[in-house]
Amino acid sequence: MNTVKPESIALFCLTPGGVALAKRLAAMLPLTCFTSEKLREEGFIPFDGGFANTARQAFTTYTALIFIGATGIAVRVLAPLVNDKFSDPAVVVIDERGQHVISLLSGHAGGANALTRYLAGMLGADPVITTATDVNEMSALDTLAFQLNARMSDLRTAVKTVNQMLVSHQRVGLWWDAELTEEIGQCDIRGFIPVDDLQRLPELDALICVSLRNDLPELPVLHWKLVPQRVVAGIGCRRDTPFPLLATLLARQLEAQKLDPLALKAIGSVTLKKGEPGLMQLASCCRVPFKTFTAEVLREFEHHFPGSGFVRKTVGVGSVSGPAAWLLSQGQLLGETLREQGVTITLGVSH
């Protein structure tokens, strides 16, 4: 099952027919619609410096772009910007009569194939998808990573190798850690060989292990670990706590729970720490969002955790890391809170 993430989609139309189709789509899906000043209607934004300039700006700021018109126009406008399948946005092209929806760029990792199917279903159109795994009715490793919001230490190499194996009808196994098996039904796993027991592997050419953990056993087959981002960290610290200390303690706390650092999804703290350099650098280094909560919100959950009078006097709540992790994980905490050198770290898991 493909997942569509429609929260940041820009749509471009250049003709009256394109505007009419854009209005149909905008009634069913959150879109930011751009057109010329001449064709502009209520709800549309005029091009800024022309169509090409606006489209190129959107390429770097939206997760997906939809062009209503000729495929060639989209290709010519975006060609100078195309960089990498793992960073470029999804690009989809639709003819102005809504008969064909074409996945043009970032089909798997960017979600263009999923968006194409979704739009085609809405319009009753023909989805045009040309990626080899899809035309052979198989999933792909980058599709699976996209659906799971997962990371891999060498994703680029793995995607190239595994997808080629799949379309060559080689046997690629797929194993899920027990705590993640409920997510299988949300993913397209066509073409993979299900593996239930790492100690009793079937005959395989390669294996993908879906896990949050850092303690997988040695395996007698070419394998990669796909790590969904599910772990959150609530962190409290003194002002000007250095980044190296925060990074060291977070790594230690993750290791204590046998968690792969790639599983980290978000870091949270109190609003007073919103501009804390060490925490901001930590989130940037881990490539995760840094979310903060007001003292008032944290106080609603502080009764679950030991409090500190000093912390309460300083930030307005007796405990920061625990309530922050509770909020980020909806109360699904992992292990004990780390307390060291003025730093507290509480982990949770958010599915």
Regions found by a protein language model. Give the residues of each.
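N-terminal glycine-rich "phosphate-gripper" loop used for MgATP/nucleotide binding
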Residues: 67-75, 80-83
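C-terminal edge-of-domain segments
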Residues: 204-218, 223-226, 324-351
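N-terminal beta-loop-helix "entrance" segment that forms/cooperates
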Residues: 33-57, 276-277, 301-307
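General beta-strand structural signal in soluble alpha/beta enzymes
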Residues: 33-36, 67-69, 93-94, 127-131, ...
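N-terminal basic/disordered segments at the start of proteins
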Residues: 1-38, 334-343, 347-350
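C-terminal non-catalytic interaction/assembly regions of soluble proteins
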Residues: 262-323, 329-333, 339-343
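Short, structured active-site "lid" loops
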Residues: 48-72, 283-290
